[in-house]
Amino acid sequence: MLYTDGEKVLCFHGPLIYAAKILKAEKWTGEENVTGQVGPHYLVHYDGWKKTWDEWVPETRLLKHNDENLARKATLQEAAKAGSLISSAEKSAASTSAASSLKRAKDSELPDRKSASRGTKRSREHVEAEEEFLKRPEVKISLPDELKLQLVDDWENITKNGQLVPLPRNPCVKDILDDYRKHYLASKRSDPSKQRSPQLVDEVLKGLKLYFDRSLGQNLLYRFERAQYVDYRKKNGPKMGDGDVGNARTANGSMGGEMEPSNVYGAEHLLRLFVTLPMIIVHTSMDAESISLLKEHLAEFLSYIVREKHRLFVREYETASPAYHRISST
């Protein structure tokens, strides 16, 4: 057992890490249990929480209580605060927009009563559409704990250590998606009982590639990486990553195939997409059933990333030169 009774630890609870204490340690052999997993399990008590929150957790949710992991804990909390602010700002902006629409509909008075009726109806429909959007349930994509740690390490390497992901990456995002498709369809041949639809997985992977290519330049880079991105574009293709997920005109392929971000960047940046993906999905017209099916496919894809993480993620980030630091700070 990696942890012992009474040991202070750090434990994942949802997307964040909390200080906790091991109350009891057991090795579970049957899958019929509260976690559905076998192997070492620990009864933990979260510091400062009521005993009703005590729970059994598998070993994968625990971290040693040391300075390195405490830094990870703080980083995740900072990221969560930033995410909450963004979410609140978006909801506030949407609410303000709806309120403004209501006011415009109320204040507008046209001489032609028939035209006024049509205008009021359009305004009312617009407001109702916005209000309906605000009522839509939040889309959550659960990242495996190993990938949460990967995100934290990635953030620290770039923003704290001044390092960069070497470009181009091998495998790149396109390679990863192609490899996953082969793996997904091969699992059907090895287990015919599994329902595997080539058309469905193709749609999911096509969507991931599209979102990645259109989001990379605007949403998936840390500030320190932007100079590298600009330099690579100058040398290899100025249109790389110019797309916008919400812009149908640019979404129809405004850049050359070899210059697409999915041919240049790899798993490190693809993983960041899954942080912003819920906000992208909630802005689509997908119904609840389609979203549920998509989430199932994304969960399976993330499990594949975990299994292949040693092959997919870069082993060593490159240290940026003093000249790069000067450029990136301007």
From Swiss-Prot:
Positions of disulphide bridges: none
Ranges of Basic and acidic residues composition bias in the record: 104-115
Residue stretches making up the MRG domain: 135-329
Keyword Nucleus annotated: yes
SUPFAM superfamilies the record matches: Chromo domain-like
Record-annotated Tudor-knot domain positions: 5-62
One Pfam family recorded for the sequence: MSL3_chromo-like
The UniProt record lists the keyword Chaperone: no
Any single GO CC term annotated in Swiss-Prot or TrEMBL for this entry: nucleosome disassembly/reassembly complex
Residue ranges, annotated region (Disordered): 96-129
Record PROSITE patterns: MRG
Localization terms from the record: Nucleus
InterPro entries: Chromo-like_dom_sf (IPR016197), Chromo/chromo_shadow_dom (IPR000953), MRG (IPR008676), MRG_C_sf (IPR038217), MRG_dom (IPR026541), MSL3_chromo-like (IPR053820)
Example GO biological process: negative regulation of antisense RNA transcription
GO molecular function: histone reader activity; methylated histone binding
Protein family: Belongs to the MRG family.
Protein name: Chromatin modification-related protein EAF3
Native source organism of the sequence: Mycosarcoma maydis (Corn smut fungus)
Gene behind the chain: EAF3
